[in-house]
Curated annotation (Swiss-Prot):
HAMAP family in UniProt: Ribosomal_uL11 (MF_00736)
Record PANTHER family: 60S RIBOSOMAL PROTEIN L12 (PTHR11661), LARGE RIBOSOMAL SUBUNIT PROTEIN UL11M (PTHR11661:SF1)
Pfam families attached to this UniProt entry: Ribosomal_L11, Ribosomal_L11_N
PTM annotation: One or more lysine residues are methylated.
Alphabetical GO biological process terms: translation
Family that this chain belongs to: Belongs to the universal ribosomal protein uL11 family.
GO CC annotation: cytosolic large ribosomal subunit
Record note on quaternary structure: Part of the ribosomal stalk of the 50S ribosomal subunit. Interacts with L10 and the large rRNA to form the base of the stalk. L10 forms an elongated spine to which L12 dimers bind in a sequential fashion forming a multimeric L10(L12)X complex.
Full protein name: Large ribosomal subunit protein uL11
Native organism: Erythrobacter litoralis (strain HTCC2594)
NCBIfam families registered for this protein in UniProt: L11_bact
Function: Forms part of the ribosomal stalk which helps the ribosome interact with GTP-bound translation factors.
Gene3D superfamilies reported in the protein's UniProt record: Ribosomal protein L11, C-terminal domain (1.10.10.250), Ribosomal protein L11/L12, N-terminal domain (3.30.1550.10)
């Protein structure tokens, strides 16, 4: 018989550096989840990822206070900023350019994010990532 689900918690947790401090501790503590157990399991699961990359995580809390979690790929904006070598996007999108990003870099990001995106093929995924780039004030160039 399946366990009864008590609720879901959606959090953005830095890869490999989960610790009981806020915002993670209070969010898990409210549901009665063993915080240290989650931190150890999460850090082990994100061991192969780049340290401190923001990882969207969905934690399923069961009625018996046990849990399971699903980690996704780091956020698209994080991957875009890393590829374009910028600290943040443009404050005035459409007026001030924050920089450029190559089509090949967009494809690489789209391939990484493909499992998390609502796209059927790589071309659709690239369009989604290009839209994020434009929203950040980046110009997508050939190459």
């Amino acid at each position: 018989m399946a366990k009864k689900i008590d609720g879901y918690i959606k959090l953005m947790v830095p890869a490999g550096t989960a610790n009981p401090s806020p915002p993670l501790g209070p969010a898990l503590g409210q549901r009665g989840v063993n915080i240290m157990e989650f931190c150890k399991a999460f850090n082990a699961a994100t061991d192969g990822m780049e340290k401190n990359a923001p990882v969207p995580t969905v934690i399923t809390v069961y009625a018996d206070r046990s849990f399971s979690f699903v980690t996704k790929q780091p956020t698209a904006t994080y991957l875009i900023k890393k590829a374009a070598k910028i600290k943040k996007g443009s404050g005035e999108t459409g007026k001030v350019s924050a920089g450029t990003i190559k089509q090949s870099q967009v494809k690489e990001i789209a391939e990484t994010k493909m499992p998390d995106l609502n796209a059927n093929d790589i071309d659709q995924a690239m369009k989604i990532i290009e839209g994020s780039c434009r929203a950040m004030g980046l110009e997508v160039v050939e190459g």
